[in-house]
Structure formats: structure tokens, C-alpha cells
């Protein structure tokens, strides 16, 4: 059975002898993400990232493809990379690593653990499970996202609930960071 990677903002990597998922399905410019990597047989391709296609896996026993790199953003001050692709699973070989930006690592078929989950608050993709017959490990969970609002210093920002934060950028601007659903009040 061919395993097809799902399309999305960034595409999923191809499973054994399958096809990779397309990225940027919304048709945005600049693009919001790239396609997953392909495979010819065996190991899976890596998931696409915000700035790069996931790596393809070669013919068995090649390792799983690495996840595509995410996008750096310095809205908080120091640059942080977000939305890396998950690594492809390995078949009797090494699994792919997650892409920079929180992508989870893939798993090989030496056991039944699922693929690694994406890093929280980065939007990184989950890594692929392996192919340990008869058990087929599941893929890892995608990392939760984050919303950051930046305003000039003259504004006052209040956020709820308390899990979200209101801080000051090193340059003086105000920042509201949301890691859970909440409300922003600007005055």
C-alpha cells in the first residue's frame, strides 16, 4: 500500500513508495511552506518546512529524509526559528532528523515508539513512525503554535489568561505573546 504525505501549509513526507504532500496549499505569496520529501522505497521522506522542502529518502536501506528547515524570526529580539518539518521514518535504517524550527525526529522500525513530537510553541511538524510489522508506530504530534503581537512603546498591552504574556522588546516596543487562546486589549 502506498503511503501518501498529506498536503498543507507545509507538506507531509512520502511513506513507502508513496508521494509527498504539497506545501503552500493556500497559494500564498510569499509561500507559507514547502512540500515534503519523496521516496522510492522503504524509508519515508521528511516533512516540508517553512523555508525548505523535506529531504527525500533513497532506495532501501537508505535513511529517512530529514525535515525541511523552518523560518527564523526576530520579533522577540533574539532570532527564533519556527515551523521546521518532521523527520521521515527509517526502514531497517536511520530515521530522519527534524528540521530546524522544532521539527520532531522520525523513528526507525527497531521498536514501536512513535515519531518524535514537534517542539511546543514552534509549530514544528511531528516525526514519522517507523515500519515495525505488525505494529505500525504512529507519527509524532505537531508542536503547538504561537502568536506574537508587537506594537510601538506608546501603547499599553493587557492579555488574558495569565499563561499569555505582555513584555517589552529590548528595543522598547511592547510585545504580547499568546501560547493559548486568549484576549488582547490595547490602550
Model-assigned labels for residue ranges:
Residues 1-187:
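Low-complexity, glycine/proline-biased repetitive segments and flexible coils/loops
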Amino acid at each position: 500500500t502506498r503511503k501518501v504525505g498529506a498536503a498543507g501549509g507545509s507538506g507531509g513526507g512520502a511513506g513507502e513508495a508513496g508521494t509527498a504532500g504539497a506545501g503552500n496549499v493556500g497559494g500564498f505569496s510569499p509561500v507559507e511552506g514547502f512540500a515534503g520529501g519523496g521516496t522510492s522505497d522503504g524509508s519515508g521522506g521528511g516533512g516540508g518546512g517553512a523555508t525548505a522542502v523535506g529531504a527525500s529518502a533513497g532506495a532501501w536501506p537508505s535513511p529517512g529524509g530529514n525535515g525541511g528547515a523552518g523560518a527564523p524570526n526576530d520579533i522577540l529580539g533574539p532570532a527564533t526559528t519556527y515551523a521546521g518539518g518532521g523527520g521521515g521514518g527509517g526502514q531497517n535504517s536511520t530515521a530522519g532528523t527534524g528540521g530546524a524550527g522544532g521539527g520532531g525526529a522520525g523513528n526507525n522500525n527497531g521498536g514501536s515508539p512513535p515519531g518524535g513530537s514537534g517542539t511546543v510553541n514552534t509549530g514544528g511538524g511531528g516525526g514519522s513512525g517507523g515500519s515495525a510489522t505488525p505494529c505500525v508506530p504512529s507519527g509524532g504530534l505537531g508542536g503547538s503554535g504561537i502568536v506574537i503581537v508587537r506594537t510601538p512603546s506608546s501603547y499599553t498591552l493587557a492579555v488574558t489568561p495569565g499563561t499569555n504574556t505582555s513584555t517589552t522588546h529590548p528595543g522598547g516596543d511592547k510585545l504580547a505573546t499568546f501560547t493559548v487562546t486568549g484576549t488582547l486589549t490595547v490602550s
